[in-house]
């Protein structure tokens, strides 16, 4: 048996350098180039430059709607990384300009409110995510867990923090139906067992 393996890891900066070289040469960026350059900047935590590039992409009238929606998410990551929480929230909401809400965006909005102790608002967004179906034919980057496990486990956590364990526990069970081996689900399962013990 012959195996072909790479001797070393790939160059994670390769694509970023390509776009940076294009910029140095003053080459014209097509909307698609701006989008992918922005994603590369975000993945390398270059948030200020990423914010600028993604905003330029979102201002451009051209560009595929799925890329616009994801660019709004990536812009939010930049804003969070720069400590601009309100701008991050606005970036997520901007995605609604392009199409119906996606599970990924709803989960991001849920997380925004969860992290700030605003559990009722978080519940709203996680419930929206749980009620959506992924647009598999769209060609978009889909995070399957944003349509089942993530909103379910998060709803369990939100309701627990609200003191509504009668709602929290069923959502944890639902999360377990999606990922029965999840350490988070299993830990919560033990927590609820202890809670309900007489």
Where do the language-model regions lie?
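TPR-repeat structural position
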Residues: 12, 47-48, 85, 119, ...
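Short coil turns that delineate tetratricopeptide repeat
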Residues: 27-28, 62, 66, 100, ...
């Amino acid at each position: 048996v012959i195996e072909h393996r790479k001797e070393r890891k790939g160059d994670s900066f390769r694509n970023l350098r390509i776009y940076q070289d294009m910029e140095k040469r003053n080459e014209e960026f097509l909307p698609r180039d701006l989008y992918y350059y922005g994603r590369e900047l975000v993945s390398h935590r270059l948030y200020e430059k990423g914010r600028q590039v993604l905003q330029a992409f979102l201002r451009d009238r051209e560009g595929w709607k799925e890329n616009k929606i994801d660019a709004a998410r990536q812009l939010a990551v930049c804003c969070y990384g720069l400590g601009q929480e309100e701008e991050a929230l606005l970036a997520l909401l901007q995605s609604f300009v392009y199409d119906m809400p996606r599970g990924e965006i709803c989960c991001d909005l849920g997380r925004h409110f969860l992290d700030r102790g605003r559990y009722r608002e978080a519940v709203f967004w996680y419930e929206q995510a749980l009620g959506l179906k992924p647009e598999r034919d769209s060609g978009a980057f889909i995070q399957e867990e944003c349509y089942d496990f993530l909103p379910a486990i998060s709803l369990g956590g939100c309701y627990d923090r609200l003191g509504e364990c009668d709602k929290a526990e069923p959502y944890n069970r639902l999360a377990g139906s999606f990922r029965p081996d999840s350490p988070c689900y299993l830990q919560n399962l033990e927590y609820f067992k202890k809670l309900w013990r007489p």
